[in-house]
């Protein structure tokens, strides 16, 4: 279910540490990002949110198998690999959500009959994994030079038993939460690109979570900008 209503939300602050662009009113965990750290992909990025870490590699635009070829745009594929073992139902579901988000911003019509593949490797999962995957994918796409109409980011929210909203929840907070909601938002209009929800919540709470995620996305996009400025100012 998708809502784009802007509503004020009361947010419980979680103290964060590390290099991130947060102000005192933002409760996201610390961020860290490193790009161009893999040699084989066309672009790569490692994204850290608290103790959750994801490594992303982007291949393409490249040749595509005839069976997967789309005549008027690029074929976009997302592969998510868990930390241990083989991909299961949860990974396949996240792959679909991430692919839908990427397809909403990637200008695939500029590279018809090609493939763009995003490979994500979970390094550690300490909560808000889907949001971290989205952020890693975006920074890897930027590193690969894939044309996009906007950047995107993921923000997760948890609602505890008394209705308190927690942004960027840890694994413990997710387990104790009544509901966990993850949103993908673009950098131009803070437009909702994708939502994934689990648990019980009211329409009002959904709107509150979306409004909180839209506000928090400003901090994520500021971190993107400062991270890219630091990287390219060195080169």
Swiss-Prot record:
Q: Provide any one GO MF term from the record.
A: RNA binding
Give positions of region: Disordered. Answer: 1-24
GO biological process, alphabetically ordered: defense response to virus; DNA deamination; mRNA catabolic process; nuclear mRNA surveillance; poly(A)-dependent snoRNA 3'-end processing; RNA catabolic process; RNA processing; rRNA catabolic process
* Keywords from the named record: Cytoplasm, Disease variant, DNA-binding, Exosome, Intellectual disability, Nucleus, Phosphoprotein, rRNA processing
Q: Which residues form the signal peptide?
A: none
Modified positions (Phosphoserine) are 20
Cellular compartments annotated = Nucleus, Nucleolus; Cytoplasm; Nucleus
Entry annotated with the keyword Methyltransferase: no
Q: Which Gene3D superfamilies match?
A: GHMP Kinase, N-terminal domain
Q: What is one GO cellular-component annotation here?
A: cytoplasm
| Pfam families, per the entry | RNase_PH (PF01138), RNase_PH_C (PF03725)
* Phenotype for residue 206 to H: In CABAC; strongly decreased interaction with EXOSC3, EXOSC9 and EXOSC10, when assayed in a heterologous system
Stretches of Basic and acidic residues bias are at 1-13
- Identify the tissues in which this protein is expressed: Highly expressed in a variety of hematopoietic and epithelial tumor cell lines, but not in normal hematopoietic tissues or other normal tissue, with the exception of testis.
Similarity-based family: Belongs to the RNase PH family.
What is its biological role?
A: Non-catalytic component of the RNA exosome complex which has 3'->5' exoribonuclease activity and participates in a multitude of cellular RNA processing and degradation events. In the nucleus, the RNA exosome complex is involved in proper maturation of stable RNA species such as rRNA, snRNA and snoRNA, in the elimination of RNA processing by-products and non-coding 'pervasive' transcripts, such as antisense RNA species and promoter-upstream transcripts (PROMPTs), and of mRNAs with processing defects, thereby limiting or excluding their export to the cytoplasm.
- Disease in which the protein is involved: Cerebellar ataxia, brain abnormalities, and cardiac conduction defects: An autosomal recessive disorder characterized by global developmental delay, impaired intellectual development and speech delay that are observed in most patients. Disease manifestations are variable and include infantile-onset hypotonia, poor motor development, poor feeding and overall growth, and ataxic gait due to cerebellar ataxia. Additional variable features are dysarthria, nystagmus, variable ocular anomalies, spasticity, hyperreflexia, and non-specific dysmorphic features.
Report quaternary structure and partners: Homodimer. Component of the RNA exosome core complex (Exo-9), composed of EXOSC1, EXOSC2, EXOSC3, EXOSC4, EXOSC5, EXOSC6, EXOSC7, EXOSC8 and EXOSC9; within the complex interacts with EXOSC3, EXOSC8, and EXOSC9. The catalytically inactive RNA exosome core complex (Exo-9) associates with the catalytic subunit EXOSC10/RRP6. Exo-9 may associate with DIS3 to form the nucleolar exosome complex, or DIS3L to form the cytoplasmic exosome complex.
Q: What is this protein called?
A: Exosome complex component RRP46
Q: What are the top taxonomic ranks of the organism? A: Eukaryota, Metazoa, Chordata, Craniata, Vertebrata
Q: Gene symbol? A: EXOSC5
């Amino acid at each position: 279910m998708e809502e784009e209503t802007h509503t004020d939300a009361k947010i419980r602050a979680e103290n964060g540490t590390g290099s991130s662009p947060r102000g005192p009113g933002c409760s996201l965990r610390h961020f860290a990002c490193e790009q161009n750290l893999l040699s084989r992909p066309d672009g790569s990025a490692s994204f850290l949110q608290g103790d959750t870490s994801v490594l992303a590699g982007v291949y393409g635009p490249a040749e595509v198998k005839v069976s997967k070829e789309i005549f008027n745009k690029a074929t976009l594929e997302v592969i998510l690999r868990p930390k241990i073992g083989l991909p299961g139902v949860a990974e396949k579901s996240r792959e679909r959500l991430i692919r839908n988000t990427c397809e909403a911003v990637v200008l695939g019509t500029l590279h018809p009959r090609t493939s763009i593949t995003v490979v994500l490797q979970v390094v550690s999962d300490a909560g808000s994994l889907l949001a971290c995957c989205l952020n890693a994918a975006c920074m890897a796409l930027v590193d690969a030079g894939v044309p996009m109409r906007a950047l995107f980011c993921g923000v997760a929210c948890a609602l505890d038993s008394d209705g308190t909203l927690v942004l960027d929840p840890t694994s413990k907070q997710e387990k104790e939460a009544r509901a966990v909601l993850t949103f993908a938002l673009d950098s131009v209009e803070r437009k909702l690109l994708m939502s994934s929800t689990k648990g019980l919540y009211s329409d009002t709470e959904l709107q509150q979570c979306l409004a909180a995620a839209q506000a928090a996305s400003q901090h994520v996009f500021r971190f993107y900008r400062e991270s890219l400025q630091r990287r390219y100012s060195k080169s």
